[in-house]
Amino acid sequence: MDLIRLKNVNKKYKNGVTAIYDLSLSIKKGSFVFVIGGSGSGKSTLIKMLYREEKPTKGQIVVGGVNVAKLRNKKVYKLRRKLGIVFQDYRLLPKLTVFENVAFAMEVIGATKQETRTKTLKAIEIVGLKNKVHNYPDQLSGGEQQRVAIARAIVNNPKLLLCDEPTGNLDPEMSMEIMKVLEDINNKKGTTILMVTHDK
């Protein structure tokens, strides 16, 4: 079954730049898909359209049975609650510990304290940071910070994980660690992963 389906999608910005032209694709549930391309090839635009930060100029985008392109603004938050998003720049809150950064994603959706604690510890364990729960972001390496960002993205058990160049700021060794974490999430949890990158 397709979790993502794009049909004849175009994205042209107001400055006249066409980021995506006539893109059609489908991604099956449980897949791990890479979109590889150079800078300015529309990779990040694709990710942004999937979580509705951007709208297509033309075409249809369906995520989990929802036509994202036609989704009303007030319903976008419901879509995003079903997604996990990992960015290149981690976006951790510097004054919060590893545990608090991951738990924050549960708190904003109104989860109980018990559910928040249980799911947060599980997500931190999955990314291999059980011994760092009380550390702050500035006490972690770049690879560890990205693992915290991944834990935060998966804590609510999303069906789809969108990764926008998650290894872009990391050296090759740390990049391999992050790829291993993502592969484990895909294999063990069955999470569909769409990752955009300029690396082969």
Locate predicted features:
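Helix-to-loop junction immediately C-terminal to a conserved catalytic motif
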Residues: 51
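Conserved ABC transporter NBD signature motif
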Residues: 59-67
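Conserved ABC ATPase "signature" region
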Residues: 66-67, 103, 107, 114-131
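Short coil-to-helix segment of the ABC ATPase nucleotide-binding domain corresponding to the Q-loop/switch region
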Residues: 96-104
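Conserved signature/switch motifs of ABC ATPase nucleotide-binding domains
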Residues: 135-138, 155-156, 189
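Conserved ABC ATPase signature
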Residues: 136-140, 144-146
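Catalytic Walker B motif of ABC-type/P-loop ATPase nucleotide-binding domains
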Residues: 161-164
